């Protein structure tokens, strides 16, 4: 066979013409040291704060420290295989997470990756995790109620859409229960809920998800979980991931609720990262910017102006106290950032007062303007009456003979405490709360309280049976309150007549 030189050269030319190798250019550095998920990297001179890096095995990292000759980065994933001298690449990207309706009903990790075994999210939109909170001009004052379904909160420390209300208390006082009841109560209210679990046991998160599924609340809820076994960077980032997902609904003119359970553990994770990055420690060994850690997160909850779509994002951060100490560093920080706090007390919890809300310390700085008129009408004096009762009860234990007026006040106070008791996973619509509080605070034609003759231990049963009776015989009363959101003379007349009728039916046991 004859080899022709011109044919060979033509084939070579054709092959060269079609050959196109893309050269990947990336700034690469090497790891100087790696300990507990924090790496120091040499050679990434162009890296920016908050930029994502790529470690061996496809693990991502986040730049936190920029120093003269190295950068400090938090590794967001398993780091046991990463060694000194390993190469690290810049990605040029800032951390972003999937957002949108596709996330409803899903459980994701601190970076928005699905962990519920139901396949990919297929989200159409992504957003950067760290963005600035809306300015003053874009906001509107809080004026719409965000009902929790709990009488003690909706009557005494009301929450409005766009508010930030702190829930704090010792461990095992029912903080998560208050948050979960709020989610359950808003079924059918077009409120999209986000539950961020930080540093919790995976079994606890699974139990919360099961509860939400059982009551049909997972349809409008997303769970973001950075569990106790996840690296500290994931626990630090999870709240920002959650708020970014919730902001999507706020910015599209809808209403969202986010629960951070709990921010004490996020602060501990951030302290761990900061100490490993050798940042100077401050009070309780927290870094100097731990206030900014929480303020920039909670400022993203807002009620937007009509021009911006009138959407809202309500935040319920949870803080765990140690032995009821609200004057510790993190609790005081978050109290000063939020618009009020609900303080849960272990003593009340053990006495059977649940939810165990200390009405004296709990406040809502802006929620009053969001409370419906009907609730203001019936619960106006409730807080004062309870405060007087607590004061008298403290003195009464020292004295044996009390005058009749004091005995009356104590008896009434005991019934009011019973009136505000409520079981878990049993939130009440606001119109039914108004009816129960009306029965507990208003007087009948004889000038006596409606529940004056009911023994204290039977008040809870009285309230339950009263609602059952009204639902069966007089359903129009609750409907009228729900529509008018106020108690006019007609509703009062109907309610008094129904209460008189119920008084003849209710049987006192024992």
UniProtKB/Swiss-Prot annotation:
**How does the protein associate with the membrane?**
Peripheral membrane protein
> What are its GO cellular component terms?
plasma membrane; proton-transporting ATP synthase complex
Q: Which cell locations does it reside in?
A: Cell inner membrane
Pfam families in UniProt:
ATP-synt_ab, ATP-synt_ab_C, ATP-synt_ab_N
Q: Which domain of life is it from?
A: Bacteria
Q: What is its EC number?
A: 7.1.2.2
* EC top class named in words: translocase
Q: Does the keyword Cytoplasm apply?
A: no
Site feature Required for activity, where: 362
InterPro entries per record: ATP_synth_asu-like_sf, ATP_synth_asu_C, ATP_synth_asu_C_sf, ATP_synth_F1_a_nt-bd_dom, ATP_synth_F1_asu, ATPase_a/bsu_AS, ATPase_F1/V1/A1_a/bsu_N, ATPase_F1/V1/A1_a/bsu_N_sf
User: CDD domains this protein is in?
Assistant: ATP-synt_F1_alpha_C, ATP-synt_F1_alpha_N, F1-ATPase_alpha_CD
Report the catalytic activity. ATP + H2O + 4 H(+)(in) = ADP + phosphate + 5 H(+)(out)
What UniProt keywords are attached to this protein's entry?
ATP synthesis, ATP-binding, Cell inner membrane, Cell membrane, CF(1), Hydrogen ion transport, Ion transport, Membrane, Nucleotide-binding, Translocase, Transport
Q: Where does ATP bind?
A: 169-176
Is Metal-binding given among the entry's keywords? no
Q: Which GO terms describe its molecular function?
A: ADP binding; ATP binding; proton-transporting ATP synthase activity, rotational mechanism
Subunit and partners = F-type ATPases have 2 components, CF(1) - the catalytic core - and CF(0) - the membrane proton channel. CF(1) has five subunits: alpha(3), beta(3), gamma(1), delta(1), epsilon(1). CF(0) has three main subunits: a(1), b(2) and c(9-12). The alpha and beta chains form an alternating ring which encloses part of the gamma chain. CF(1) is attached to CF(0) by a central stalk formed by the gamma and epsilon chains, while a peripheral stalk is formed by the delta and b chains.
**Role played:** Produces ATP from ADP in the presence of a proton gradient across the membrane. The alpha chain is a regulatory subunit.
Q: Report the sequence similarity comment from the record.
A: Belongs to the ATPase alpha/beta chains family.
What is the name of the protein in this document? ATP synthase subunit alpha
* Native source organism of the sequence: Anaeromyxobacter sp. (strain K)
What lineage is on file? Bacteria, Pseudomonadati, Myxococcota, Myxococcia, Myxococcales
């Amino acid at each position: 066979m004859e080899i022709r030189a011109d044919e060979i050269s033509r084939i070579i030319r054709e092959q060269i013409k079609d050959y196109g190798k893309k050269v990947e250019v990336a700034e690469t550095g090497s790891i100087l040291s790696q300990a507990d998920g924090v790496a120091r990297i040499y050679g990434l001179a162009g890296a920016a704060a908050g930029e994502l890096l790529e470690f061996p095995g496809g693990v991502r990292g986040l730049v936190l420290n920029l120093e003269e000759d190295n950068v400090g980065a938090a590794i967001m994933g398993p780091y046991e295989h990463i060694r000194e001298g390993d190469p690290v690449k810049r990605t040029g990207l800032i951390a972003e997470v999937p957002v949108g309706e596709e996330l409803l009903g899903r459980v994701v990790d601190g970076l928005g990756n699905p962990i519920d075994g139901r396949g990919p999210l297929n989200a159409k939109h992504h957003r950067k995790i760290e963005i600035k909170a809306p300015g003053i001009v874009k906001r509107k004052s809080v004026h719409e109620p965000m009902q929790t379904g709990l009488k003690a909160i909706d009557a005494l420390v009301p929450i409005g859409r766009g508010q930030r209300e702190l829930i704090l208390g010792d461990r095992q006082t029912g903080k998560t229960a208050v948050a979960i009841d709020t989610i359950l109560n808003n079924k059918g209210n077009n409120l999209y809920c986000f539950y961020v679990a930080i540093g919790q046991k995976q079994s606890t998160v699974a139990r919360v998800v099961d509860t939400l599924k059982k009551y049909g609340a997972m349809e409008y809820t997303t769970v973001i979980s950075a569990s106790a076994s996840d690296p500290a960077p994931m626990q630090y980032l999870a709240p920002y991931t959650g708020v970014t997902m919730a902001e999507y609904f706020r910015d599209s003119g809808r209403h969202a609720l986010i629960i951070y359970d709990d921010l004490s553990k996020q602060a501990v994770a951030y302290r761990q990262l900061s100490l490993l990055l050798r940042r100077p420690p401050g009070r309780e060994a927290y870094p100097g910017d731990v206030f900014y850690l929480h303020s920039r997160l909670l400022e993203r909850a807002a009620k937007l102006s009509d021009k911006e779509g009138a959407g809202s994002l309500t935040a319920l951060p949870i803080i765990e106290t140690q032995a009821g100490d609200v004057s510790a560093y993190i609790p005081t920080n978050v109290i000063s950032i939020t618009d009020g706090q609900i303080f849960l007390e272990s003593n009340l919890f053990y006495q059977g007062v649940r939810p165990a809300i200390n009405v004296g310390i709990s406040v809502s700085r802006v929620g009053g303007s969001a409370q419906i008129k009907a609730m203001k009408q019936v619960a106006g004096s409730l807080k004062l009456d309870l405060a007087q009762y607590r004061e008298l009860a403290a003195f009464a234990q020292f004295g044996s003979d009390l005058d009749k007026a004091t005995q009356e006040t104590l008896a009434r106070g005991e019934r009011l405490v019973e009136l505000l008791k409520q079981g878990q996973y049993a939130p009440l619509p606001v119109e039914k709360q108004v009816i129960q509080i009306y029965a507990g605070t208003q007087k009948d034609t004889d000038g006596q309280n409606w529940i004056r003759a009911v023994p204290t231990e039977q008040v809870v049963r009285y309230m339950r049976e009263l609602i059952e009776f009204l639902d069966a015989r007089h359903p129009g009363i609750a409907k009228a309150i729900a529509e008018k959101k106020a108690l006019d003379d007609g509703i009062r007349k109907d309610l008094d007549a129904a209460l008189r009728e119920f008084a003849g039916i209710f049987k006192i046991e024992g």
